Amino acid sequence: MTDFFAGIPQIRYEGEGSSNEFAFRHYNPDEVILGKRMEDHLRFAVAWWHSFAWPGGDPFGGQTFDRPWFGDTLDLAKLKADVAFEMFDILGAPFFCFHDADIRPEGATFAESKRNLEEIVDHIGTRMEGSKTKLLWGTANLFSHRRFMSGAATNPDPDVFAWSAATVKGCMDATMKLGGANYVLWGGREGYETLLNTDLTREAENAGRFLQMVVDYKHKIGFQGTILIEPKPQEPSKHQYDYDVATVYGFLKRFGLEKEVKLNIEQGHAILAGHSFEHELALAASLGILGSIDMNRNDYQSGWDTDQFPHNHPEMALAYYEILRAGGFTTGGTNFDAKIRRQSLDPEDLVLAHVGGMDTCARALKAAARLYEDGSLETARAARYAGWETPEAQAMLASSLEEIEARVLAEGINPKPRSGRQERLENLWNRFV
């Protein structure tokens, strides 16, 4: 035991009437919703990087947090892991996520970094034996170190490609050893700053081959989890190749990987791409590639990707409605890719941020489930497209332009516009949130 969270009680569900800030008001893990426990619907995960590795810096200032585990030794990395599992237990968090650089110190060589990762993974595995918390997904940090400034899989230097591939192999091994449900790839540096020095074709082909290697290795080692790509349009690159759901799907189709890889979709990244979160989720579900989500929010005034904890449950309810429509999570879940503000220095702030985020998502899920169970929205949606269920409409889809023209002329088809009833449906939605 450490003393970092000393005095903070285990968070329990007390209901909406509770005034205890260290209690859940909406998140009741055992509450059954649509035939499934709330915990199994939401599958919450704590992000190792924002919660335990981020020093509190921003583009205009450095570290504000003073954590006892900050440093570059394995002993401090193990202390960080011990503190992390204490918070997981306080929250009752079912999952966590990590990058390799979050959990192990950087070595002077690749071999040393590999040994460090293996040792800390053994330590984390020991901690997991005494905890209910499991690994939702692991990933490799291929963007922070200066070697990745021009990308990893898309780097013009073959040696960086090699280093990156070897790093991913080690992280996949670590993820499998810890029983991870997924493995994530995020291409923060897989993009460009200027076309003046960029070969788009080569970079795309190298990225495609890299991903094929990842999929091949997954099957070789017998990893039963899902490979996930996380889209983002920019930050840190000016233009990233995994821009949004549609772009990534085109990339997967190009390299024959659309049946092998799904997506980890982040709320903040969807906003950066000019979409709503629910749009990206609905499109991914339509394409059969919805895997998992990162839950956070941006600053809507500045437009920055601020990775704040969610607190707007009506907005989140739209997202969870699309997840319910898609059948819910299988291997995926709700990872809080969110960080407390750099002025929030106290251990209590870190715990309460997760309490608020978990309650917000639980409240959103309950609202989405009520509407989904009611069925009114789906009835209205089906009625709008009912004409396509007729034999004539189905036959038209199997015919030709010439045949359709002949039918329009013969039957004097002259369609009249029909209301989309948007305001009615918005009012319906508001009744449930």
UniProtKB/Swiss-Prot annotation:
GO biological processes: D-xylose metabolic process
Q: What class of enzyme is it?
A: isomerase
Can you list the GO cellular component terms from the UniProt entry?
cytoplasm
Q: Which PROSITE patterns match?
A: XYLOSE_ISOMERASE
Query: Which subcellular locations apply to this protein?
Result: Cytoplasm
Q: How is the cofactor bound?
A: Binds 2 magnesium ions per subunit.
Binding-site list for Mg(2+)? 305, 307
Catalytic activity, as annotated: alpha-D-xylose = alpha-D-xylulofuranose
Mind listing the GO molecular function terms for this protein? magnesium ion binding; xylose isomerase activity
* Similarity section: Belongs to the xylose isomerase family.
Oligomer and partners: Homotetramer.
- Protein name as annotated: Xylose isomerase
| Gene designation per UniProt | xylA
